[in-house]
Amino acid sequence: VHVFPVGIGRIGRDTPEMITKISQKRPNPTWTPPNSIREEYREKGIELPQVVPAGPENPLGDYALRLAYGAGDYLIHGTNKDFGIGLRVSSGCIRMEPKDIEWLFEQVQRGEQVTIINEPIKVSLEPDRSVFVEAHEPLTRSDGSKKLLQIPVELKWWLQDADIPSAKAKAVIFAQNGVPVEITPPMIEF
């Protein structure tokens, strides 16, 4: 599993949860703004071109992975600006740092499965038996209020069975900063 900071769809243009596949890999993509986005910009007094060619003005950056979900309208792509990663600012696509999308683009194949989830707490048991916990604010689709997260009962049971103090997991969950943190105590070698 690889973890990357991403930008996702803003409220009203949410990035949907999905299980899909990569339908297309496009280096140096062009961007054809959909009519809905063109209209949004027009209302702000900005006229978007019919097609934005590859290059420094293209908001998709240098790489795009088209997802097969729905009509294929969703992409995982780079960006041409140092803005939006870690935020809800896109029109539904998943925006990545240029170096991260370049790496991902080289690693994945057309037809590979992609799963988009919305889980505020994630737990990973690694092959070396280390455990990582990541927590972020739950995404809201309406009022923007924060929700106090609790340690899931399954994680509590696992922490007890593995004899791992829950204080570190609680701190990660309370912080809600989206950073995976190892919660297993260091191994003591004699």
Tell what function each PLM region has.
Residues 20, 29-32, 44-48:
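Soluble "head" domains of membrane/secretory-pathway proteins
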Residues 7-10, 28, 80-82:
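Short, solvent-exposed aromatic-acidic interface loops
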Residues 36-190:
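Exported/periplasmic cell-wall-interacting domains
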Residues 4-5, 32-33, 41-43:
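Secreted/periplasmic proteins
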